[in-house]
């Protein structure tokens, strides 16, 4: 003990104990007044481990001290990565897993969620590095053992001080009157907010309905166009403000505002037919901007009978033309969604009213935030920033929650009314942009490059090229911004009339739909749906081509952002993309690719693998044990191979790969075991010698990591990427192993 006391004298607030029981007793005394307990991956590890250790070292009765009012922790099973895990829920005291909070409130997938890596990324600090196992560290370097444990706790504290996710969850809980732990989901929070809004109006909320287990919650998705592939110059984009919440507000969508539904006999027959022929549900809706019944109404069709299912239980059979007369020409306060759902605007629905209030509140909060930033009041700035972020989370969560069958207010008619009406609005925006530039109302016209959900990318450059070359139209970065602003203003002014014509929305409701010019880019690369990049120099009026920089890159869906692409490859792809968007020539870029291949070749084999997540390992192993050789995903097989080789080599120190773990998959050459690949855990900081000596298949990994990734990025340019492999192939002929 004296030696240990000497080792810790430089560490404040560090207490040594003779026994584990004494330490746990002190821990329970320390947390007696704590409201929230948190740790990193604490739901799956720290919480069950601590409960079990208290039970063993003290007694089961002592686990009551983790809770309030003398209650016992409640054992709970939950599914994680396809496997059943066990944890404990505390009574009275809240436990929030910092790892799960981080996943919830950061919107990009990380390569790894190891505390070490997240600490480095967020606060510039990592865990204390040591050799061997923690047991060896405890026995051989007690001082570093203490330092390691203190740094773990310090990292969590610094992450919380910077990110304030526990505070954010607490604010959400108070705003929506739910329990703190309830904020980890989205449905219950949104549902309670709707209930509160209804009660505020003096309304009674209906009981939770029983759902048909066979009912579908599938709804047609957003409009996504096929892009005009390749490089484009002088690109502008328009973006509809919060499309789905705005659609819900404009058509006053809510369970209590539904008047009737055009039964989708024709639509369902078409969708079922496509699915029967092999289409997916999403593909079956490709190119449709409304149900067939809605289109019959808009075309004033008289040839097809439509059944209207009224909300009072009655039905009517009418033609499209007759329904048009009832809704559009009879002065009824009715609106028709693109899904064929009839809503009333006689009174404001609870959900649209809630969205309206949240919008107004967020606007006020953002105004206060700007005042605090201007006054350099950091304390108030943090407060208002957190409040407006909560409102943003609420707004973005509502649509997804009401389309979840677990939500009390779930109604597929509202979900599909939102998406299909949103499709039509996005199509109108693109068509109107093209009309302003070319004179033709066409959503895939000459000026339109791409459309995705709530945005449209366009360019007037090719359409006006002759006039620009003749000098008839001034064309500079500044004049392009002015031109695209003018186009956006003209398009934006057309939404109220469009909403009246298409959905019988009163002007006051149609004005809810608004769009603005988002970016102006000097160049853009469009590859396929959901995959593109632009180099923009102006975003919503703020210039980004300052301090000698050409602007900023916006990249969507590319491998340089994907978590299954190695970090060094992400950086290289970003370098190539930057060169392409800055106008570098093919020869220069191919030369750089050739250099990178040489650099790649020099890397050890384990650095050339592909990141994956290994799910359902346990299930596949059980199937294989029962039925012999079983088909499974390659990365799962590679993970099992790691576990087998670890066991064969007597490796007791490396980490076993378990369900849900992130791994790096490395290809290997022919070998006596017949393995084609072996994975290793992303979080394995010290790779064993037996793994480093595996016969890695460098050429196959080069194909996977370089060839495929480059083809995904710049293959649409049809450059001679094959030429960059020739020197590399030649030099490999003289490599001996």
Predicted regions: what they are:
Residues 3-14, 18, 37, 47, ...:
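Active-site-proximal helix-loop-helix substrate-binding element of RNase H-like nuclease domains
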Residues 18-34:
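Short, basic/hydrophobic alpha-helical segments
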Residues 35-43, 449:
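Short glycine-rich phosphate-binding loop at a beta-alpha junction
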Residues 78-88, 105, 212-408, 528-547, ...:
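Catalytic nucleotidyl-transfer cores of nucleotide-processing enzymes
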Residues 127, 426-453:
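Active-site palm subdomain of RNA-directed nucleic acid polymerases
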Residues 135-283, 377-432, 450, 459-461, ...:
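Common nucleic-acid-contacting/processivity interface regions adjacent to the catalytic cores
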Residues 456-487:
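Catalytic palm subdomain of template-directed nucleic-acid polymerases
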Residues 485-737:
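C-terminal, non-catalytic extensions of nucleic-acid polymerases
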